[in-house]
Amino acid sequence: MKLIFNLLFLFSAFISQANPQKTGFDKQAFYNAMSSDDLEEINTLLESVKASTLDEKEAYEGALLMKKAGMVSKAKEKISLFKTGRTKLEEAIKKDNTNTEFVFLRLIIQEHAPKMVKYNSNIESDSALIRNNYKNLPSVVQKAIQAYSKKSKVLKALQP
C-alpha cells in the first residue's frame, strides 16, 4: 500500500512539473509577457494567474497589472490598473520581504514607471538584493534577470 501511495505521489509530482499549465502557471510564459509589449499576451496571462492556485499569485498579478497600465490608452484605466497592481505587489513583498523574485518584479516596474506616480524609492536597495541573491534563484528567474539586465540602468549586465 505504501508503495502505491509513493508511486502515485511521484507520478503527480512529475505531471505537475512536466506540464506547468496543470498548476495554472508557467513562469517562462510570465517573463516572456513581462518583456513584451503585447497587450493580448498580458491579458491572457492575467487570466491564467488569477485562475491559478499559487500562493505567490498576488505578486505576479500585481506586476502584470502595472505592466498593462503602461499599455492602455485611457488615463483613468491606467491609474486604476497601476494602483491595483502596486497594492498587490507591495502586499506580496510585505508578506515575504526576502523574496528576491518579487523584488525583481518591483524593480522592473519602478525602473520604467513615470516619475509622477512616485514609484521609484526602492530601486537601489532592490538592485542590491537581486545582485546578492541572484545565484540562489531558480534558473528561469536567473535567465529573466540576465535578459532584463541588458536593458537596465541599475542592473547593467549582471554576470552569472
Model regions and ranges:
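Bacterial Sec-dependent N-terminal signal peptides
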Residues: M1-F25
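Helix-turn-helix repeat elements of alpha-solenoid scaffolds
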Residues: N32-L45, K78-R86, Y119-N120
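Short coil/turn linking the two alpha-helices of tandem helical-hairpin repeats
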Residues: S35, K67-K76, H112-V117
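TPR/TPR-like (Sel1-like) alpha-helical repeat modules
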Residues: S80-T87, K118-N136
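Terminal, low-structured helical/coil segments at or just beyond the last alpha-helical repeat
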Residues: S125-P160
